[in-house]
């Protein structure tokens, strides 16, 4: 009985072998798709991706418990508007008395320097013929010729007054300027209320004169006094221009 199925299989195999030998390929029809398999195990982590864009800032956090250290000082601001003056304070206590001038060494040194500078200046001007010294008086001229009133103003601005001789030595010193500039000069005398009565600028009578022969002869019309190149005097109208000579 078992030989019949076996013979059938051999026949089928022989027939199949004949077909395969001819085409060398066994072609079957596609089967029906099977059911999906179960999920496999999770795979390994992939590589890191590219860096993304920064996200938006988060909300401000709560204040910290530790205070921050103070920052550096800022730049100075612009000056403010000056305030109103305060009330005058009470006078301070009276200071100790100063030393007498002759005991103050610093003051004496300063005065010594001043004297030295003055003497140097006087010496330099004397060499130039700009000043003449007689006793305690210093006579000086700038060589300009102006009216009597203008000379008085110029000498006052310089801290002196118009030159006036009170003795022969001073008269000779003034005459030296008259000779140098070869022009007459006014002296500090003016005629008083009475004709021919000439006085000093302070109104005191003249105690020294050197009038030219026959002078004064203006009889009240010539109220100033000019000096000639020989040192003699003549009364003259005050509106003429004469050499400026001052005394200090």
Swiss-Prot record:
Residues 28-100 form the Collagen-like domain. Changing residue 50 to V: In allele 6A(2). GO terms for biological process: opsonization; respiratory gaseous exchange by respiratory system. GO terms for cellular component: clathrin-coated endocytic vesicle; collagen trimer; endoplasmic reticulum membrane; extracellular region; extracellular space; lamellar body; multivesicular body. Residues 42-51 have a biased composition (Basic and acidic residues). Disulfide bonds join 155-246, 224-238. Keywords: Acetylation, Calcium, Collagen, Disease variant, Disulfide bond, Extracellular matrix, Gaseous exchange, Glycoprotein, Hydroxylation, Lectin, Secreted, Signal, Surface film. GO terms for molecular function: carbohydrate binding; lipid transporter activity. InterPro entries: C-type_lectin-like, C-type_lectin-like/link_sf, C-type_lectin_CS, CLec_Tetranectin-domain, Collectin_CTLD, CTDL_fold. It is found in: Secreted; Secreted, Extracellular space, Extracellular matrix; Secreted, Extracellular space, Surface film. Glycans are attached at residue 207. Residues 132-248 form the C-type lectin domain. The modification 4-hydroxyproline is found at residues 30, 33, 36, 42, 54, 57, 63, 67, 70. Oligomeric complex of 6 set of homotrimers. Interacts with CD93. (Microbial infection) Binds M.bovis cell surface protein Apa via its glycosylated sites; probably also recognizes other bacterial moieties. In presence of calcium ions, it binds to surfactant phospholipids and contributes to lower the surface tension at the air-liquid interface in the alveoli of the mammalian lung and is essential for normal respiration. Enhances the expression of MYO18A/SP-R210 on alveolar macrophages. (Microbial infection) Recognition of M.tuberculosis by dendritic cells may occur partially via this molecule. Can recognize, bind, and opsonize pathogens to enhance their elimination by alveolar macrophages. This is Pulmonary surfactant-associated protein A1. The gene is SFTPA1.
């Amino acid at each position: 009985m078992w030989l019949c199925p076996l013979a059938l299989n051999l026949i089928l195999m022989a027939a199949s072998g004949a077909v395969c030998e001819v085409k060398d390929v066994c072609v079957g029809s596609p089967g029906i798709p099977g059911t999906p398999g179960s999920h496999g195990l999770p795979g390994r982590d992939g590589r890191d991706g590219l860096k993304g864009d920064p996200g938006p800032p988060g909300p401000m956090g709560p204040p910290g418990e530790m205070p921050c250290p103070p920052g550096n000082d800022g730049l100075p601001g612009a000056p403010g508007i000056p305030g109103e003056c305060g009330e005058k304070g009470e006078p301070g206590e009276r200071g100790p008395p100063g030393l007498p001038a002759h005991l103050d060494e610093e003051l004496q040194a300063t005065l010594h320097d001043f004297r030295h500078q003055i003497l140097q200046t006087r010496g330099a001007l004397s060499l130039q013929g700009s000043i003449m010294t007689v006793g305690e008086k210093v006579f000086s001229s700038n060589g300009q010729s102006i009216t009597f009133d203008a000379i008085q103003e110029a000498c006052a601005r310089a801290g002196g007054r118009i030159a006036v001789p009170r003795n022969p030595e001073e008269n000779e010193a003034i005459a030296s300027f008259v000779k140098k500039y070869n022009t007459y000069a006014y002296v500090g005398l003016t005629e008083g209320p009475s004709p021919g009565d000439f006085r000093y600028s302070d109104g005191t009578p003249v105690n020294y004169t050197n009038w030219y022969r026959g002078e004064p002869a203006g009889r009240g019309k010539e109220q100033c006094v000019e000096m000639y190149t020989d040192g003699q005097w003549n009364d003259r109208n005050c509106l003429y221009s004469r050499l400026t000579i001052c005394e200090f």
